[in-house]
Structure formats: structure tokens, C-alpha cells
């Protein structure tokens, strides 16, 4: 077992009840272009086209053969593009239940599948996009070979769903999906199942080729970047792949039914949610519809993903992200506070002892307010308190801010994704957002070396 001692469990109100309910019915779903790092789409549909679930919507020009398939049947109502015609979303109005079927196998056959059989089904169904690489967090090329594959079956993000609750609903499908993963490279590459040390994820009998790694401690103990760092670290010449536990369920369903499984069980939670709980919805769900009559009055920000590293869901991207397993809702913090810096701050939280809210175990109604403007980095040891990885965070963040990619690479930035620096952003006295800085550095390193 690996114990994470440095980090932070955010004391945020609105913790979800770990019981699954049916969410609001949604009649719109979307694929979000921003989810796929570096992807350039070659569109296979137009507005007004009627599509089946599992039909190809677009292909990656930079990664030929990697296709992105419709999460529902219906009509393509809008293809949203932003600046420089960057794809924002492909929106489908859900109609009917027509779907494309793929090759199915008996459960007893899964352990003897060839790598080619597994790969073909994943590619044709679009489930190849469940994999992401580290470094760079991109959908892997079809000819890429990783050092290992990580399955993340734990989540320490604030307000997250408990994977154990979800996996009890799909125990057989999860096991089938894990078996399929062991066959992707004919059993030649290790598959690591990372779980909470206290969780009772059903894996009996043991699956050949699956190695279980247990983690405990504070967030980011549940991030895949943490798992990779301690189990099979990556570098400039070494790549691993990872995917989440609900995509493993979908893979198991695909191979045993021949159908694309697009259900998602997510956490709908946060200070502004009336009844925080786990809800059953679908991949790419319209979040305005999903959260209708679920939120407290006022101006709210709906986030696809975690409050620490998720994306604001509004306008053309008002949809559940491909990799998001939670929807978080905060009040917009637009109110100005006169002399707030000299107040005791019993209703505020800080990792430093500058406010009364630091003491005790109270949960706080966090808002989107950052309580200050962006300014220079202030190295007071805050980053070191929340960074459990074997890197020097202050120096790394300085290099990212300065655009020094050579030094940043030497300090370990290739191991990281935006979510791995989210706590550094949260505790930064200078209110700097290090996620975009990291992404800019990674893009430059990938392009220039």
C-alpha cells in the first residue's frame, strides 16, 4: 500500500449521498472537441444528418484511424466551432434507439482473444478514445505501445462518487473489461488496477494479468498521475496509458453485447445542489437539462468535473465531458467584501492559519471567488504541502510561469497533467493558474523536443 500524506481534502459542503438515483431525462448529448488534446477533426457528418449510436462523427487527422462515435441516436442539430474554427461540440438531439452493433463474444472467450480482435473492436466502436497517454494526455496512436496500462478505480476529488458503489452495479462487466485489457497486447504489458486501500472492489477470482495497487491518504491519492508516479513513472521516451473504471465497464459491455454502452453514473454535488447524490445519466448529457430544478436559486456555475480541475459548462460546451465522472455546482462569487482581509474569516477556509476557518472540521460553502487578483508567485511553502510527488514544486511552477521548458522537463513536468497541479493553483497566494502553463509547456516540448 502507498500512503499519500501531502495533499488536501477540500472541506466543501454539498457532499453527495452515495446512493444511485435516476437523473433528469436529457434529450441532447454532445461530443466536446476540447476534451481531446491536439485532435484535429475530419468531420464525417453535417448538421441535419440522422445518426445511429456508435456511428462515426469525426476522425482525427493527426491520428488516422482514431474515430469518435455518436453517444446516442438522433439528429445532428449543431456543430459548434470557436476561434480559428476549433471544434467545440457536436450536438445530437436524442431520437430513437437505433445503433450500430459490433463484434460480440461469449464471456468464456474473452481470456483467449487476440490483440488484433481487441484492438479492432475498440477502434471501430470509438472506445479506443477511452485511453489517454502519459505524458501529454492524448488519445494514443494506433501503433503506439505503452509500458503499462493503468485503470483508475478510486477518486479522491472533492464531492466525487465512490467507485465501489458504482462497481457493485456492474461487477461482471468490470471484470470482463479488465480481462479484455489484459489481451490488448496479448498479456505482454502489465495492467495496474489502482484502488483505495479501504475499498472492497470485487475481483474474485483474481484475473490473470491484473496487478492491484492500493493507495490511501489525502487528495491527490486518487489521481492517476499519482499512481503512475509511484508505480511506473514516465519520461520523454516512455509512455503509459490510463482509463477510468467506468470506461472499463463500457469495454466489458461492448465485448459481451456488441453494443456501445454510454450510461454514466456521476456525482451531482456541491454547495448549490439541493439534493447532492449519485445520478444515472448518459455520456455527453446536456447539463442544463440534467441540473434543471436541482439547484438553489441564484447565479450558479455548473462544472463538468471536479471543482479543482473541471471545465465550466455553458453555451456550446454545456455538456458532460467524455472523461468527467462528476458535476459540481458553485455559486458565482461576485460580491465584493469591504476590508475582508482584516476579518476573522470564520466562514472562509485556508491552508494557512490566516483565518479562523482553518481550525476545526467545518464544511464550507465555497464559491467561485478567488479573493484577490493575480500577482507574482510567493514561495511560502504552500505548494510543498500539497505536492506528494517527488518533484520540487516551487522551482517547477516558476519554470512553467517563465516558459523555461528545458528546466521544467528536467524537473518532471512530463509526468503531469493539469489536474496534478490543481491543488497548487488552489493554494497559490498569487492566484496563478498553473494548468494552462503546464499545457503550453507540454505542447512546446512535444513540438520542439
From Swiss-Prot:
EC annotation from Swiss-Prot or TrEMBL: 7.2.1.1
One of the GO BP terms on file: sodium ion transport
Record flagged with keyword NAD: yes
Matching Pfam families: NQRA_2nd, NQRA_N, NQRA_SLBB
Keywords: Ion transport, NAD, Sodium, Sodium transport, Translocase, Transport, Ubiquinone
Reaction catalysis annotation: a ubiquinone + n Na(+)(in) + NADH + H(+) = a ubiquinol + n Na(+)(out) + NAD(+)
InterPro entries for this protein: NqrA (IPR008703), NQRA_2nd (IPR056148), NqrA_C_domain (IPR022615), NQRA_N (IPR056147)
Stored NCBIfam families: nqrA, PRK05352.1-2
PANTHER family with a match to the protein in the record: NA(+)-TRANSLOCATING NADH-QUINONE REDUCTASE SUBUNIT A
Family to which this protein belongs: Belongs to the NqrA family.
Protein name: Na(+)-translocating NADH-quinone reductase subunit A
The organism of origin for this protein: Actinobacillus pleuropneumoniae serotype 5b (strain L20)
